[in-house]
Amino acid sequence: MARLFRASCLLSLLLAGFIPPSQGQEKSKTDCHAGVGGTIYEYGALTIDGEEYIPFKQYAGKYILFVNVASYUGLTGQYVELNALQEELEPFGLVILGFPCNQFGKQEPGENSEILATLKYVRPGGGFTPNFQLFEKGDVNGEKEQKFYTFLKNSCPPTSELLGSPDRLFWEPMKVHDIRWNFEKFLVGPDGIPIMRWYHRTTVNSVKMDILTYMRRRAVWEAKGK
């Protein structure tokens, strides 16, 4: 009886949004599906200043880390860690791409022209400038989601069974494979095929170790195949 009462209380708190909705339900990462149809090279996006459309095939032969970002999130500090990751793994072929999105708690409210200034002077602040490419703000879930995010999400299972508190999520319709929050990450391999997907709270250091492990494993596979 006590166990049932506790479960009932936890459910009430969950529905009220007082505890993290995915607590105990998330995985730090998931491996993407085998036999994915198509590649990321079929897509592209406009840079944050709107001046250049970059086809993702420009990154052929590289590892691409896709990150949906926000300037007023509790995880915005990951920007600093992502800069360090880009610098450290760029010699090994990693390219980080950032995609501002306002669908999670309305935490990216500014215009494209305001985002870089926010990062520089507010959060993370202190003159911060990302050393990786940012693209125009857009949707990653819902009716108007960017098509390459549809491809990524369909290629990789979600890292959490639950979406979260509906009053903080701003899109429709909601689907099981949707991105859960800001700073979720997808890794695409040198052949344009998605490899891994990370939960938004997985540390950037853990992401780095997963990427390095995969790079080493792939190098062994390719050496054996020659």
Swiss-Prot record:
Root EC class: oxidoreductase
InterPro entries to which the protein is assigned, alphabetical: Glutathione_peroxidase, GPX_AS, GPX_CS, Thioredoxin-like_sf
The enzyme's E.C. designation: 1.11.1.9
This protein's GO CC annotations: extracellular space
SUPFAM superfamilies found in the cross-reference section: Thioredoxin-like (SSF52833)
Single biological process term from Gene Ontology: hydrogen peroxide catabolic process
Keyword Oxidoreductase among UniProt keywords: yes
Native species: Bos taurus (Bovine)
The family this protein is said to belong to: Belongs to the glutathione peroxidase family.
Assembly mode: Homotetramer.
Protein name: Glutathione peroxidase 3
Cross-referenced Gene3D superfamilies: Glutaredoxin
Reaction equation(s) it catalyzes: 2 glutathione + H2O2 = glutathione disulfide + 2 H2O; tert-butyl hydroperoxide + 2 glutathione = tert-butanol + glutathione disulfide + H2O
Compartments reported by the entry: Secreted
Tissue specificity note: Secreted in plasma.
PANTHER family for this protein: GLUTATHIONE PEROXIDASE, GLUTATHIONE PEROXIDASE 3
